[in-house]
Amino acid sequence: MYDEALAVDRIRAARAAVDAGGEPFVLVGRTDVLLVGGGLDECVRRANAYLAAGADCAFVPGAADAATIGTPVRELDGPLNVVMGLTGNTRTLDDLRELGVRRVTVGGSIARAMYHHLLRAAREMAERGTFSYADDQLSPTELNHLFRRA
């Protein structure tokens, strides 16, 4: 984890670059304090420093229960971003809205879920010689409809 002053300087520089570019962009101030065993006080202090330096929202990986989400929501000077889609997440979007979360990140969880399905299909073909994995797929019509909308 970066020294706090260095992290603030980096966010300040990123904000200047974003503003100079003129394109819509969300600058996220991420603090990994909870992931490295730090407490909520340090987490909130760092996140508020990042917001003051120009971050549009504060991203706090590791905030998952009502306390670790609710405290930053109440004490931050800007919106909170949390990560969901990890193993064991039981909160819903409605739960997160009620707690005051303004942005949700899913990271690579959707891709990892797809890789899991791919690996299951490959193992089924290699080990059993069957193709039942294909029973759970989008039809060509559904795919074409999705691509037309995109």
Task: Label each region the model flagged.
Residues 16, 108-150:
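Extended, intrinsically disordered, low-complexity segments
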Residues 1-82, 86-106, 113-115:
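Alpha/beta enzyme core
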